[in-house]
UniProtKB/Swiss-Prot annotation:
InterPro entries: PsdUridine_s_RsuA/RluB/E/F_cat (IPR042092), PsdUridine_synth_cat_dom_sf (IPR020103), PsdUridine_synth_RsuA/RluA (IPR006145), PsdUridine_synth_RsuA/RluB/E/F (IPR000748), PsdUridine_synth_RsuA/RluB_CS (IPR018496), RsuA_PseudoU_synthase (IPR050343), S4_RNA-bd (IPR002942), S4_RNA-bd_sf (IPR036986). It catalyses: a uridine in RNA = a pseudouridine in RNA. The keyword Ribosomal protein does not apply. This is Uncharacterized RNA pseudouridine synthase BB_0129. Keywords: Isomerase, RNA-binding. Pfam families: PseudoU_synth_2, S4.
Length: 249
């Protein structure tokens, strides 16, 4: 179970030593406090990752309690690496997540350096393994954009199954959105699968953006932001995975 504190702005500032709760209420009435880039109003609550600004002081809300397991979603920007360390000093996706949390978490699978979108983090090893195991057929949905026109013949071949340098790739379904863009659904998480297939035909994709894993959607999560995935979503997905495991035994 995850219990997330969501204090009102004036309570949070008081806990940070800015002044009494009443004093902090007055600061808000006088429009001297901002949450991120918006002037705070009385009654506003802070959420995970919010930056509360008063004069030159900046406080980041990261106070919450974790019991048992935690499940997080990040909207990974391009040019962030899915690793805990990089000898070349590139930016790490974990750096957008770990500072907000007391528990050590790790990513469930990866998104390549140039790709963006939904990346899940957890401290639940079994759940992570179930998500990435090929037998589970967990869907991953992407929006792609190409500099060239999308070749539907390539997508048809990809859906039928295609070999690239002795590696077999297969698309579950696709939808062409316009001449340069398409929606792809995969049910395996092979490394750089989409990019490899298109590069095999000398097609460079300028955008690969993941918007869904199973029943977990990116929704309106902004680039670089993190949210806690509701346990109702996690439990629903776990239930589906457990049924598949039972049927395979």
């Amino acid at each position: 179970m995850i219990a997330l504190k969501a204090p009102r702005v004036h309570v949070f500032l008081a806990e940070k030593g800015v002044g009494s709760r009443r004093f902090c209420e007055e600061l808000i009435r006088k429009k001297l406090v901002r949450v991120n880039n918006t002037i705070a109003k009385l009654g506003d609550k802070v959420t995970l990752g919010d930056r509360i600004i008063y004069k030159k002081q900046i406080f980041v809300f990261k106070d919450f309690q974790i019991n048992n397991r935690i499940y997080l979603a990040l909207n990974k920007p391009r040019n962030y690496l899915c690793s805990n360390f990089d000898v070349d000093g590139r930016k790490l996706a974990i750096s957008l997540v770990q500072p907000l949390f007391k528990e050590r978490v790790f990513s469930i699978g990866r998104l390549d350096f140039k790709s963006s979108g939904l990346l899940l983090f957890t401290n639940d090893g079994k759940f992570a393994n179930d998500i990435i195991h090929p037998r589970q057929k967990v869907e991953r949905e992407y929006i792609i954009e190409s500099k060239k026109d999308i070749d539907e013949n390539l997508l048809i071949s990809f859906k039928s199954g295609i070999k690239v340098k002795k590696e077999f790739f297969k698309l579950k379904s696709y939808e062409i959105l316009n001449k340069n863009s398409a929606r792809l659904i995969l049910d395996e998480g092979k490394n750089r699968e989409i990019r490899k297939v298109f590069l095999s035909k000398n097609i460079f994709l300028k955008k690969i953006h993941r918007i869904r894993i199973g029943n977990i959607n990116l929704d309106s999560l902004k680039e670089g932001q993190v949210k806690i995935v509701p346990l109702s979503k996690i439990n629903s997905l776990k239930s589906r995975l457990e049924k598949l495991n039972d049927n395979s035994n």
